[in-house]
Amino acid sequence: MQYTHPVLHMEKVCRSYKAKGIKRNVLSDLSLDIHPQEIVCLLGPNGAGKTTTVKIASTLLLPDSGTVEICGVDAVRQPRKACEHLSLLLGGEDGFYLSASAVDNLLFFAQVSGVPLIKQKALINEALVKVNLFEVRDQPVRTFSRGMRQRLHIARTLVAQNSLILLDEPTTGLDPESASGVRQLISELRHVPSGILLTTHTMREVELLADRVVVIQDGKSIFKGTLEEMRNSVEINHVSTYLAHAVSEDQIKKLKEQVGGSSVEVLDKCDSYYIDVAWTVSVPNELDERMFTWKKVNERNPSLEEVYLGLLSGRRKKDER
């Protein structure tokens, strides 16, 4: 993929809050770039700084220090000018005039975004067709389901035709069918063409959409790269699944001491247990038969979720640190 200048450039961004007189660093020297026609997924545990990053990128928050540029515009010094180039979609269904129709809402946002009057009707109709809402365009938004409102949010970004799209957990709370439809629409936003920053907790979403991934923890970036680079960055060799009819706390404790606590997952299925063990090159890749009489039933490559958890627990390859 050929990249031009970034639509979003963040360099050494810091942000802190004060609560009860105590300063808490939320972002520490965070840097990232988003280019046209790519989707970058921002991952991290709750409280890692994902939403703060999106708010700073959207000019809703000012950084304490660092550089934020949107399409070359200094977003700290010229936030209004920078906003002309971006669309923000926060997880949830708010943000519309509920008593107004879908068309009237999009007309309002088109005017706010500075879309030329002569183009508004055609762009709105085209967007409503793409998100499968054209047939209900004249209905009040209050009659729309949560999934329909999320699709209307995406229609709003299509009408605005902005270079940067910020999506903060856009499929949160949606049923599987609605979430799948929203993911398909997000994938098609590449052709606008726009650069997209997407926060999510759903690894399936990352696998389907991400061109690159940024993982943050405690406000700091701990990984940047493609999905393949992410998979290759941890020490996890493979994952073995064992079947047991009884599991003691002592067994699990010993196993976690051997391979690390985040590398063991136990699933209780009534009269049996399935134990997933993520092995690394630095430990023996088999159980001690004197202590464990479990039966191995499967061996596979680590899932993206297991790779992600490995990153968070510090299990990166030494040459990647």
Residue ranges and their predicted role:
Residues 44-49:
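Walker A (P-loop) phosphate-binding loop of ABC-type ATPase nucleotide-binding domains
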Residues 107, 111, 118-136:
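Conserved ABC ATPase "signature" region
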Residues 165-169:
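Catalytic Walker B motif of ABC-type/P-loop ATPase nucleotide-binding domains
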Residues 2-10, 16-29, 79:
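A short, flexible loop at the N-terminus of ABC-type nucleotide-binding domains that lies
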